[in-house]
Amino acid sequence: MASKTYTAGVKDYRETYWEPDYKIKDSDLLAVFKVTPQPGVDREEAAAAVAAESSTGTWTTVWTDLLTDLEHYKGRAYKVEDVPGDDEAFYAFIAYPIDLFEEGSIVNVFTSLVGNVFGFKAVRALRLEDVRFPLHFVMTCPGPPNGIQVERDKMNKYGRPLLGCTIKPKLGLSAKNYGRAVYECLRGGLDFTKDDENVNSQPFMRWRDRFEFVMEAIQKAEEETGERKGHYLNVTAPTPEEMYKRAEFAKELGAPIIMHDYITAGFCAHQGLANWCRDNGMLLHIHRAMHAVLDRNPNHGIHFRVLTKILRLMGGDQLHTGTVVGKLEGDRQSTLGWIDLLRKPYIEEDRSRGLFFDQDWGAMPGAFAVASGGIHVWHMPALLSIFGDDAVFQFGGGTLGHPWGNAAGAAANRVALEACVKARNEGRELEKEGKEILTEAAKSSPELKAAMETWKEIKFEFDTVDKLDTAHR
């Protein structure tokens, strides 16, 4: 009989993975989870269980523990905090040694942090609230293929946000009629038009036909306006091979930008496409379709600030972030937080905006924040005040819903934007004087006047579901 060299039995997670005196290292990957434990499971045990199951642990002692250095590789729960206004949940702060993760692989990081641990019976609900990616890891990630400044240089557009429009109806148009709508919007004054997230290659409009008619529209609009124009050609496809085929065809046609649904398509496919864009000088617009499945429940899932961080790491030049003022979910302070995460080189911890950690991006370029969803000309002063210049404002229905047509809708948005930028540069307070600014601009723009009349009663005043914790406001 073999001699006994270790103590068998079910593990007490707290004994191994709870270390309140742990000294955090610069190279550690830090995560904070909102944990709702099962009745009878205390906080320290639940936090330690999350640390174990998301790193080196299993439910029982195994003899192969003797063949590795557990102290070096294990995750450590080092702090718990109350969740303001919630008597059941708490925050668990966990430090992971960087050697647990493959360099530059968000796929690998997420497989640990939001993998099997989310089905662990010791917790009733679990939400990944924030992650501090150490600079050691950030430097191994590709980041945005181009970044804000390079995109401005490619498009020759400075000193203001960019204007876009999602072509509507999103499904059902023929390729030729789709191209016509693109031309009218770009000719009217927009910088970009866009495929919607579920426009791929359906029977009513195959992708190759769409690409050709859209590029014809872009070239015509550029010739007539003297401005650089673009359209987000969605290359999302059933397979990576098909995705690259579509991207290559867009490049052959001379498209400046393509688009990808980074969550539904998968992180592996997305990071590969971002690398392709970098190698081929192509701008990359990112749609976040499916994000609310992951981030809207305030107790279980992944917060959007984490999805923002991983997109910047994997690569994207523009990302939908919500609008605050439109029809989609988005608390103002939280939105301001993840806008900064997308654009700035260094972000300090700020609980009032939901930021649990400092985040150093090193030399990694930032990306444009995209405001889209239920916005129209009356929102322009607030949008410019909230987002600043390094953003894209996309008016879908707020362009194509204009009573005089697509070109008039585009012209109204362009006039409204330029009026607000001028007022901002003169030192006026946009959110206080917005109505006056727009009304004055409308005197010389019948398109803007008609748009203001059309949407003067349109508001989206539903309360936000996923709010910052009350004590952090």
UniProtKB/Swiss-Prot annotation:
First and last residue of the signal peptide: none
Hydrolase found in the keyword field: no
The protein's name: Ribulose bisphosphate carboxylase large chain
Catalyzed chemical reaction(s): 2 (2R)-3-phosphoglycerate + 2 H(+) = D-ribulose 1,5-bisphosphate + CO2 + H2O; D-ribulose 1,5-bisphosphate + O2 = 2-phosphoglycolate + (2R)-3-phosphoglycerate + 2 H(+)
Function: RuBisCO catalyzes two reactions: the carboxylation of D-ribulose 1,5-bisphosphate, the primary event in carbon dioxide fixation, as well as the oxidative fragmentation of the pentose substrate. Both reactions occur simultaneously and in competition at the same active site.
Comment field (misc): The basic functional RuBisCO is composed of a large chain homodimer in a 'head-to-tail' conformation. In form I RuBisCO this homodimer is arranged in a barrel-like tetramer with the small subunits forming a tetrameric 'cap' on each end of the 'barrel'.
Residues modified as N6-carboxylysine: 194
Family, as annotated: Belongs to the RuBisCO large chain family. Type I subfamily.
UniProt keyword list: Calvin cycle, Carbon dioxide fixation, Lyase, Magnesium, Metal-binding, Monooxygenase, Oxidoreductase
Needed co-factor(s): Mg(2+)
The species this protein was found in: Halorhodospira halophila (strain DSM 244 / SL1) (Ectothiorhodospira halophila (strain DSM 244 / SL1))
EC number(s) given by UniProt: 4.1.1.39
Annotated GO biological process: reductive pentose-phosphate cycle
Cofactor note: Binds 1 Mg(2+) ion per subunit.
Binding site for Mg(2+): 194, 196-197
UniProt key word Magnesium: yes
Pfam family membership, one: RuBisCO_large
Molecular-function GO term, any one: monooxygenase activity
Residues spanning the membrane: none
Subunit structure: Heterohexadecamer of 8 large chains and 8 small chains.
HAMAP family: RuBisCO_L_type1 (MF_01338)
Residues the UniProt record annotates as site (Transition state stabilizer): 327
Top-level taxon in the UniProt lineage: Bacteria
Active site, UniProt feature: 168, 287
Amino acids binding substrate: 116, 166, 170, 288, 320, 372
Gene name for this UniProt entry: cbbL
InterPro entries recorded: RuBisCO (IPR033966), RuBisCo_large_chain_AS (IPR020878), RuBisCO_lsu_C (IPR000685), RuBisCO_lsu_C_sf (IPR036376), RuBisCO_lsu_fd_N (IPR017443), RuBisCO_lsu_N_sf (IPR036422), RuBisCO_lsuI (IPR020888)
